[in-house]
Curated annotation (Swiss-Prot):
Entry keyword DNA-binding: yes
Keyword Calcium applies: no
Protein name: T-box transcription factor TBX6
DNA-binding segment(s): 100-273
Keyword list, A-Z: Developmental protein, DNA-binding, Dwarfism, Nucleus, Transcription, Transcription regulation
SUPFAM superfamilies: p53-like transcription factors (SSF49417)
Function summary: T-box transcription factor that plays an essential role in the determination of the fate of axial stem cells: neural vs mesodermal. Acts in part by down-regulating, a specific enhancer (N1) of SOX2, to inhibit neural development. Seems to play also an essential role in left/right axis determination and acts through effects on Notch signaling around the node as well as through an effect on the morphology and motility of the nodal cilia.
UniProt region (Disordered), positions on chain: 271-339, 360-379
Compositionally biased residues, Low complexity: 325-339
Superkingdom of origin organism: Eukaryota
Effect of residue 111 to I: In congenital scoliosis; uncertain significance; decreases transcriptional activity
């Protein structure tokens, strides 16, 4: 038998089986040690063999102090060790789009969070100086809560409305260029525009999980390491900018923020005054849908007195949106763009195949001298005129008469095949849709 002091000498004098010494640890006074006394146990049966052990009641002593660790990603650093936030001397970080962030911060920045994830705007765009050009660094970003309050929009400003919800699992976004040399990071600004925010706690894509109606602060970390999963860290620096504080929402609450986002975000140009998603354009599209199809739109099919050439008679108002101010009244009939050939072309059918299913009956039909083709295994919902082959082609094995009207040679027996592809499964540029 061995005494624990002999087996574990590295534990130090703090781990003892005897009574704690009053002066051993000032943070653990003897009065508190009484509360941690073990319950009275039966007399050990091996006391005769361990006569040297102390018979005093066994108490718990204080644990030895733990060494200081670097701050974990996604957690607040310890205020007693501010030097741990910047262990890369000479490295500085500046916010490139500071003026844009200040403009949003003066109103109260809001960031949309969705289940699928939504990108931040404005995005964090920084420039770094003072790095070792030959060393490798990692750029990381995380988002931490600013305080322990939940906020609510009160018509003109945000006000605290209660205690914050429990903190969600912390996640860190790693810049896709990491790890890279210091010369690479200092060559141009570093953008975190791909960061996405979500409110789904079960998100499998690695997006940053946030609570709605809470105030958050992005942090940018710069870590010196040779590899992405390296265990040998050469230093770390964390940076925060007061202008980047925002409140996470599922829908914009402040109308001024909505206008700023539309004016500054290049991807929101459709919501501007003359954009496709402005109120005027949306109302015009609704009116066109309620008006229904124009009666003159189908009369252009099969007009045989038009000159030959490329035909695109199916491109109506649903594809090319016209100016709502020039839209015709419900009682007026607008003349559809006249085709330049005798019948619809292959491009027209590929764009709108459903438009030919109800084509009028006066379309040109198969020539009587053209015999019925053998069953090709699939039905042809369009007119038989589209199945005719040019004169002299040996596609069907029957003597073919000249077609009644000219048409583009895009259709073979049994249905359309994309050219120059010779087998089903090819893709066309029109809509990028597979034919089969």
């Amino acid at each position: 038998m061995y005494h624990p002091r002999e087996l574990y000498p590295s534990l130090g004098a703090g781990y003892r089986l005897g009574p704690a010494q009053p002066g051993a640890d000032s943070s653990f006074p003897p009065a508190l040690a009484e509360g941690y006394r073990y319950p009275e146990l039966d007399t050990p049966k091996l006391d005769c063999f361990l006569s040297g052990m102390e018979a005093a009641p066994r108490t718990l002593a204080a644990h030895p102090p733990l060494p200081l660790l670097p701050p974990a990603m996604g957690t607040e650093p310890a205020p007693s060790a501010p030097e741990a936030l910047h262990s890369l001397p000479g490295v500085s970080l500046s916010l490139e789009n500071r003026e844009l962030w200040k403009e949003f911060s003066s109103v109260g920045t809001e960031m949309i969070i969705t289940k699928a994830g939504r990108r931040m705007f404005p995005a964090c765009r920084v420039s770094v100086t003072g790095l070792d050009p030959e060393a490798r660094y990692l750029f990381l970003l995380d988002v931490i809560p600013v305080d322990g309050a939940r906020y609510r929009w009160q018509g003109r400003r945000w006000e605290p409305s209660g205690k914050a919800e429990p903190r969600l699992p912390d996640r860190v976004y790693i810049h896709p260029d990491s790890p890279a040399t210091g010369a690479h990071w200092m060559r141009q600004p570093v953008s975190f525009h791909r960061v996405k925010l979500t409110n789904s706690t079960l998100d499998p894509h690695g997006h940053l999980i946030l609570h709605s109606m809470h105030k958050y602060q992005p942090r940018i970390h710069l870590v010196r390491a040779a590899q992405l999963c390296s265990q040998h860290w050469g230093g770390m620096a964390s940076f925060r900018f007061p202008e980047t504080t925002f409140i996470s929402v599922t829908a914009y609450q402040n109308p001024q923020i909505t206008q700023l986002k539309i004016a500054a975000n290049p991807f929101a140009k459709g919501f501007r005054e003359n954009g496709r998603n402005c109120k005027r354009e949306r109302d015009a599209r609704v009116k066109r849908k309620l008006r229904g199809p124009e009666p003159a739109a189908t009369e252009a099919y099969g007009s045989g007195d038009t000159p030959g050439g490329p035909c695109d008679s199916t491109l109506g108002g649903d594809i090319r949106e016209s100016d709502p101010e020039q839209a015709p009244a419900p009682g007026e009939a607008t003349a559809a763009p006249a085709p330049l050939c005798g019948g619809p072309s292959a491009e027209a059918y590929l764009l709108h195949p459903a438009a030919f299913h109800g084509a009028p009956s006066h379309l040109p039909t198969r020539s009587p001298s053209f015999p019925e083709a053998p069953d090709s295994g699939r039905s042809a919902p369009y007119s038989a005129a589209f199945l005719e082959l040019p004169h002299g082609s040996g596609g069907s094995g029957y003597p073919a008469a000249p077609p009644a009207v000219p048409f583009a040679p895009h259709f073979l027996q049994g249905g359309p095949f994309p050219l120059p592809y010779t087998a089903p499964g090819g893709y066309l540029d029109v809509g990028s849709k597979p034919m089969y």
